Design a protein with these regions (language model features):
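M16 family metallopeptidases and their MPP-like homologs
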Residues: 1-36, 54, 66-94, 116-122, ...
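Short, conserved secondary-structure transition motifs
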Residues: 20, 53-60, 153-166, 276-285
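Peptidyl-prolyl cis-trans isomerase
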Residues: 38-41, 46, 99-101, 278
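PEST-like low-complexity, intrinsically disordered acidic/proline/serine-rich tracts
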Residues: 58-66, 147
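An aromatic/glycine/proline-enriched structural segment found at the starts
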Residues: 81-83, 113, 118-183
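Conserved, carboxylate-rich catalytic/transport cores that coordinate ions
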Residues: 108
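PPIase-associated folding chaperone regions across multiple families
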Residues: 187-195, 199, 212
Length: 307
């Protein structure tokens, strides 16, 4: 068929994706529908992937960056929040050891419902052509109730807390700082992203210029906002030379306080640079079918208006 078919998951959604040539659409759609409705979950493949995941967790537990990504969400959200799992996406050794093929089947039966799904299609096809094909292939897909995930707000901490993972012999320290930010779908999202770009979201951002270019303590430091429907992680990441760990933490706090507390607000020049950068990106955002698909999927996932 020359088609591409893949599946994936993130903090909020699971996806089934396929891409096919127009003259191969019908057989490709049949394969797509079969995966959505009747996933096989072969036992041999399941056991192989399970062992691969356990090995991946072992590797993560000796990598400083991966170690931090594993524990950081639990510190932000607590044990019972849906976002409190390791950001590596690999889970815990205990949960992976205990999972069975039946758990996969139950997950699919519980969550994969047509009333809980959205189909985004981009290509040389009309709705009049596509809809009858989908109605025929997905006719047996029955709606039903789905559980509610715990993505509630978490209380903001009233003071800063430092957690240390002691790893003797490390060549450098890995600093993760952050807190819980508003969900992606909020009326001030553009302003929040602009703020993050100035703070640590670009090479010329304040944190990177401070720790890399001015102090020469790091090869690169940055801040990031992860995408999520619920309260999402805001993270500052900085690998620094070991003897500058404490001073680097103070510099990061200084840069955060400068924006948050208004001690060093975003300048007109910084804002203009961010605005021009975002504007110049726009023409190329819809150049390919996949680019359009990504943007539309983003709109659907976070409930943005189509305009």
């Amino acid at each position: 068929l020359g088609a591409r078919l893949s599946t994936g998951s993130d903090l909020d959604v699971s996806t089934v994706y396929f891409s096919a040539l127009r003259d191969k659409l019908d057989p490709s759609l049949e394969l797509f529908a079969d995966v959505v409705l009747h996933p096989a979950f072969p036992e041999a493949d399941f056991q192989r992937l399970k062992q691969q995941q356990l090995v991946a967790i072992q590797r993560e537990q000796v990598s400083p960056v991966q170690m931090a990504l594993r524990v950081f969400p639990r510190l932000l959200y607590g044990e019972n929040h849906a976002y409190g799992l390791p950001l590596t996406g690999s889970g815990t050794p205990e949960s992976v050891q205990q999972i069975t093929r039946d758990d996969l089947v139950r997950f699919h039966q519980t969550w994969f419902k047509p009333n809980h799904a959205t189909l985004v299609v981009v290509g040389d096809i009309t709705m009049d052509e596509l809809l009858p094909k989908l109605e025929r292939l997905l006719a047996e897909w029955n709606p039903g109730d789905v559980p509610q995930k715990n993505i509630q707000d978490v209380p903001q901490k009233d003071r800063s807390v430092v957690y240390l993972i002691d790893r003797p012999g490390s060549e450098q320290s890995i600093i993760f700082a952050g807190h819980v930010a508003p969900p992606e779908a909020n009326p001030r999202e553009l302003a929040i992203k602009a703020m993050n770009t100035v703070l640590g979201g670009a090479f010329t951002s304040r944190i990177n210029m401070n720790l890399r270019e001015d102090k020469h303590w790091s090869y690169g430091a940055r801040s990031m906002l992860m995408s999520a429907r619920g309260p999402r992680p805001f993270i500052v990441y900085a690998p620094v030379q070991t003897d500058k760990t404490a001073p680097a933490m103070l510099e990061i706090k200084k840069e955060l306080d400068g924006i948050v507390n208004g001690q060093k607000p975003v300048t007109p020049e910084e804002l203009d640079k961010v605005q021009r950068n975002l504007t110049l990106r726009l023409p190329g955002r819809w150049e390919t079918a996949n680019a359009i698909l990504d943007d539309l999927s983003y709109v659907v996932q976070f409930g943005w208006p189509l305009d």
